[in-house]
Amino acid sequence: MTDLSPVLTIDGPSGAGKGTVSRIVAARLGWHYLDSGALYRAVGVAASWADLDVSDPAALVRCTFDTRVEFDDAGEAGLRVLVNGADATSELRLETTGALASAIAAIPEVRSALKERQRAFRRAPGLVADGRDMGTVIFPDAAYKVFLTASAEERAGRRHKQLMEKGVSVIFDDLLREIMARDARDAQRVVAPLRPAEDAVLIDTSGMGIEDVVQRVVGLLADRAPL
């Protein structure tokens, strides 16, 4: 039987703040949380561990089916991710893993293989789904849809600050180029290109604090229908 629990989709490009906002909103609502990007990154980590060639789609599709991904949700504190039983949380957030995940996500067979795995997260009392095609492909019937965005410069600045605070030395211009390249890949791929759902509420997070965005999203849910 299809689960009809309510779903809030939060889509947007890398660095728009959707991951942090989604986790906090899910925790405050008491809903489940899906980080769809973590699934693709997990496959990327598994492919890296297996030393697979990113230009070999067949091998990556097999890797997708063979990879076991488990989420340990820590609420607002974040998400612990196990790949085939091993903790891969820190590796998932590396820039190299993100680039690999973006390339893998462009393979139609990989997206198809992960589609039902993502939909299985939908259960009572509700789900906050964070990604790039949550409102357009995975949960097109979601009652609540949000698309977060921000300028490439703003997003590169946020990522630069995060990495510097972690002691990781990185050049801002390099990050900006990577973000712009990823935006182009995500927008131009044939299957599930990055775009807002027609019924999504667009929020430009440039210059906004996380709490401001969270309150805006929670307010949208309260305005549209009782939870």
Curated annotation (Swiss-Prot):
It is found in: Cytoplasm. CDD domains: CMPK. InterPro entries: Cytidylate_kin, Cytidylate_kinase_dom, P-loop_NTPase. It is an enzyme of class 2 (transferase). ATP binds at G12, P13, S14, G15, A16, G17, K18, G19, T20. It holds the Pfam family Cytidylate_kin. GO terms for molecular function: ATP binding; CMP kinase activity; dCMP kinase activity. Keywords: ATP-binding, Cytoplasm, Kinase, Nucleotide-binding, Transferase. SUPFAM superfamilies: P-loop containing nucleoside triphosphate hydrolases. Its EC number is 2.7.4.25. Coiled coil: none annotated. GO terms for biological process: pyrimidine nucleotide metabolic process. It catalyses: CMP + ATP = CDP + ADP; dCMP + ATP = dCDP + ADP. It comes from the Bacteria. One of its GO terms (cellular component) is cytoplasm. The keyword Cell membrane does not apply. Gene3D superfamilies: P-loop containing nucleotide triphosphate hydrolases. HAMAP family: Cytidyl_kinase_type1. Belongs to the cytidylate kinase family. Type 1 subfamily. This is Cytidylate kinase.
